[in-house]
Regions:
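Charged docking surfaces used in two-component/phosphorelay signaling
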Residues: 15-23
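Short hydrophobic/Thr-rich beta-strand motif most characteristic of the beta2 strand and flanking loop
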Residues: 25-32, 40
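Active-site beta3 strand of CheY-like receiver
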Residues: 44-50
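Receiver (REC) domain active-site loop signature in two-component systems and cognate sites
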Residues: 55, 78
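C-terminal output helix
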Residues: 106-116
Length: 124
């Protein structure tokens, strides 16, 4: 179906997203923060990255910027999934190159729909 890299420092949320996407047929890998994402992204070559914003070492904002700057990763679709729900946060998400923005707590069905759409998978 497609390959997804799930990036979140909260293990429970990371596993929740990963399990839901795996059950939908996606090949899923995980990373614990933005730096881990950048370290793994070339080897994994995902179609979509779900990316938390508030993480240690390298936050989601800067991770998205770095992904967009690099020619080998600029094409990867990015879904920011964060507790930051203010309008200026959503604007910042657009400015750093996110393709979609979901706020926590999120509906797993909506998250799956967004990832499927960005990965070019047919609707369920």
């Amino acid at each position: 179906m497609g390959r997804v890299l799930v990036v979140d420092d909260d293990e429970v949320i990371r596993q929740l997203i990963a399990v839901n996407l795996t059950l939908e047929g996606f090949d899923v890998a995980t990373a614990i923060d933005g730096q881990d994402c950048l370290d793994k992204v070339r080897a994994i070559d995902p179609d979509v990255i779900t990316l938390d914003v508030m993480m240690p070492r390298l936050d989601g904002w800067e991770t998205a910027v770095q992904l967009r700057k690099a020619p080998r990763t600029a094409h990867i679709k990015v879904v920011l999934i964060t507790a930051r729900a203010q309008e200026d946060d959503m604007t910042r998400g657009t400015n750093v190159g996110a393709d979609a923005y979901l706020t926590k707590p999120f509906d797993p069905g909506e998250m799956i729909r967004v990832v499927r759409e960005l990965a070019g998978a047919p609707p369920a």
